Amino acid sequence: MSNLIADWRDRPTHRRVWALAAPMILSNISVPLVALVDSTVIGHLPHAHQLGAVAVGASLYTFLAWAMGFLRMGSTGFAAQAAGRGDGAALRQILLQGLLLAMGLAIALGALGIPLSGVALHFMQPSAELDQLTREFFHTRLFGLPAALASYALVGWFLGTQNARAPLAILLSTNLVNIALNLWFVLGLEWGVVGAARASVIAEWTGALIGLLMTRKALRAYSGHIAWAALALWQSWRPLLAVNRDIFIRSLLLQSVFFLITVQGARLGDATVAANALLLNGLLLTAHALDGLAHAVEALCGHAIGARDRDALRRSLVVACGWSLLASLGFAVLFLFAGHLFIEMQTDIQNVRDTAFVYLPYLAALPLIAVWSYLLDGLFIGATRAREMRNGMLLTVILLLPFAWALQGLGNHGLWITFLLFMVLRSATLGTIAWVLRNNDGWFAGRVH
């Protein structure tokens, strides 16, 4: 206990955590603000199926894009460890490899996205109006996929070098452009649901181009040159691809859970899927704010592991954990006492509001339950322990399935209870793995890349 108190009182660690976390919290919060603006603008159109189309279409797009989240996570861990070693050549190679992977994956996903969306909508069994608008929204969003994946790689690389200002510039520019164009296209030009999708596409390309322009200045701090010949060798790609493979499997499992919630909600009716979308915007707001602290954990823990500094690793975790717990408590209180205002702000469709109000207590409980999984993700990403993340998520989903099946009869209440249980299991499995690694000094054993 005395060690924990001493670590918490270490002012330099607080400064390092917040130097990274504050810009990332600001930029991360802008991400769910876009979803909030989408929901608010579309939610004030006359029909529930219009809001439902944005919710389902965005869920389809997010399933594809966020499954590629390994582009950010893998880049962060390797870049942080390279920065800890002062290896400029490795930093350049990691950046280029991340961008090349992003482009290749965007092309493949763009080709697969349309038929996969048709299959998904078939299983959802939406109304005819919801089906048509969802397809139009999703097909338009696919044009922004290359830029979105490139931004993942860029943000991850910048975070690994402990540069939080560049991700702030990328994400803020993306999301502010999205908000402005959303208001113009949907309300001004009256393009409706497709207008919201077009705004997102233009915004994603804006952010990616800004990020590319900022890499040149960032690289000046690290001397070195790209070993072009090494890019043609399998050995230079193998560590990154191995980590990315495992994070991809983990991300796919995670996004499958979120996607299945949308699918099951759609089967319960247009009002239910719309209400769940509004509530999940609250989770997005919480998750992206807490992820700012988790991103600090990624960079600081990865740097400490690269420098083989056990004390710095422990102090970073203690300080980030303390602030994350305080923030999650704040969000829980906010949703408990001001949740109705949060819902009313997003839509004036009365049956959607009434449905969402019923499930507000679940949203209030989520931050306190989910915070631990976000922090542990940051630790494992910084340590490039992707295999353990994959195994933890696989075990979580396996343990969750029988509960999800048993709770089907409870309707949307069963859906939310399942989701809360998913977050509990996710934290428990990763926490157990982290405890085993700590006891075996596994965070430092053979982790130099």
Language-model segment annotations:
Residues 39, 48-51, 88, 164, ...:
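Membrane-helix interface/capping residues of multi-pass secondary transporters
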Residues 1-21, 79-146, 177-180, 186-245, ...:
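Short alpha-helical transmembrane segments in multi-pass integral membrane proteins
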Residues 36, 45-48, 82-85, 160-161, ...:
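Helix-loop interface residues and adjacent transmembrane-helix termini in multi-pass membrane transporters
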Residues 25-73, 77, 141-148, 238-303, ...:
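Transmembrane helix-bundle signature of multi-pass secondary active exporters and lipid flippases
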Residues 53-111, 148-162, 166-167, 275-337, ...:
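Small-residue-rich hydrophobic transmembrane alpha-helices
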Residues 171-178, 281-282, 361, 394-403:
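Small-residue-enriched core segments of transmembrane alpha-helices in multipass membrane transport
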Residues 363-374, 378-404:
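A late C-terminal transmembrane helix in Major Facilitator Superfamily
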Residues 36-40, 111, 119, 153-157, ...:
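Alpha-helical transmembrane segments of multipass membrane proteins
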